[in-house]
Amino acid sequence: MLSRLGARVLYCLAGLALLASGGCALMPREPLVQLPTTARAEPRPMGPATGSIFASSYAGNPLFEDRRPRNVGDILTIVITENVNATKNSGTNASRTGSTSMAFDAVPKALAGLFSSSSNASINGANALKASGGASAANTFNGTITVTVLEVLANGNLVVSGEKQLAINQGAEFIRFSGVVNPRTITGDNGVLSTQVADARIEYTAKGYIDEAQNMGWLQRFFLNVSPF
């Protein structure tokens, strides 16, 4: 009898331990930028020497052309200017009324207590619904980040991605960016606005005591996972 009771106690403790471990687990956060954040340019093969002064092999940008990114490994400055405002309002107003009346020539004895001395009955009903809701959001992100060309598409567009890390005291901040850039939108100072980048993904995260202070404690996560409400 005691052995069975001890086994049940062990099973209960094991179940509580599993629940506690599930409650303590952190929710995995998938990074928004999935592409590699850097790329190295492949070395070019040395062409045959055709002269003592001028070599006709391609060695970079032409002499009378701007130095703009066009190959894998080239760098580009992204000027982040994101201002997003969204507002949503909704409302519902509905009402319904109904009535029914009945008249009896004679009332059965079994129902005499319900109708007392009257042989008429009426039913009235009404319901109403009124609801409203609203939501608003405003996000502003300004800054610069230098990215690397990862791939040159068939139409000439550039797939870029990059990361910037900044450590301050016990905290670290990460800015990641990826997207597709049209070379025609690149300015003379080798920059492009983030609003002109297709499929742009901008991520700003941090690690440190400030980020930890914004996370829920392990006991709160435990009760949040086991609570049925």
Curated annotation (Swiss-Prot):
Pfam families: FlgH (PF02107). Residues 1-23 form the signal peptide. A lipid is attached at C24 (N-palmitoyl cysteine). InterPro entries: Flag_Lring (IPR000527). One of its GO terms (molecular function) is cytoskeletal motor activity. It comes from the Bacteria. It is found in: Cell outer membrane; Bacterial flagellum basal body. It is a lipid-anchor. Its main location: membrane. A lipid is attached at C24 (S-diacylglycerol cysteine). One of its GO terms (cellular component) is bacterial-type flagellum basal body, distal rod, L ring. One of its GO terms (biological process) is bacterial-type flagellum-dependent cell motility. Keywords: Bacterial flagellum, Cell outer membrane, Lipoprotein, Membrane, Palmitate, Signal. NCBIfam families: PRK12697.1 (NF009337). Assembles around the rod to form the L-ring and probably protects the motor/basal body from shearing forces during rotation. The basal body constitutes a major portion of the flagellar organelle and consists of four rings (L,P,S, and M) mounted on a central rod. HAMAP family: FlgH (MF_00415). Belongs to the FlgH family. This is Flagellar L-ring protein. The gene is flgH.
